[in-house]
Amino acid sequence: RRFAAAGWSLVLTGRRAERLHALADELCAQARILPLVVDVRDRVAMEQAIEHLPAEFSRLRGLINNAGLALGTAPAPECSLDDWETMVDTNIKGLLYSTRLLLPRLIAHGAGAGIVNLGSIAGNWPYPGSHVYGASKAFVRQFSLNLRCDLQGTGVRVTNLEPGLCESEFSLVRFAGDKAKYDSVYAGAQAIQPADIAETIFWILNQPAHININSLELMPVSQSWNNFAIERA
């Protein structure tokens, strides 16, 4: 919505067709919108979708890799391998597919183009139950830094955005739809809102072409790092 309001042409991707098309219908009065129903985990589907982008959407200035999820909070010995695979497939492989497939278009744009990868403070700071999710976001952080090295001289910028507590469907997915658990995460805390993340991404991609925001950690004032565990005898 933030980018559409500024007149950017947008390619929107998602798995839920009805919801995706509803958003496209909402935004089409403000900007050119192309909704693509695709699962980022499906390499072949991603290849086909990007190969067949209409000409009016072929010139790419920005890529926002925001598909990601966490599943469960159980300690590692109690976790489902299926959940671990889903997190790896989405948070790591999905991001790699979209990035590699769209890099030629970003490089062709040159100065001013940019990639924003949605990392997490979980990739920087460990906490119980984060295991694979946190590790996947640590991967995203390191990949973002390494990608910057490879793209030096192309004009393409790379940013790893690392949000903390954000009130979104993320926790509802993590708790398998348990609304009570979802509500407990945000109770009494003024969490970051998705619109705050969108505003930050908009700011990043609209920096002067000679400026790169390497990484940006974003937390609500109500959150800090003071919950370190100590085992006492």
List each model region and its residues.
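C-terminal helical subdomain
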Residues: 160-164, 179-227
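Residue(s) in the substrate-gating loop at a strand-loop-helix junction
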Residues: 120
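Substrate-binding pocket helix/loop in short-chain dehydrogenase/reductase
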Residues: 74-76, 80-88
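The beta1-alpha1 cofactor-binding region of Rossmann-like NAD(H)/NADP(H)-dependent oxidoreductases
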Residues: 17-18, 37-49, 81
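Active-site helix of classical SDR
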Residues: 99, 136
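Canonical Rossmann dinucleotide-binding motif of NAD(H)/NADP(H)-dependent dehydrogenases/reductases
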Residues: 1-10
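Alpha-helical segment proximal to the catalytic Tyr-Lys
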Residues: 104, 145, 149-150
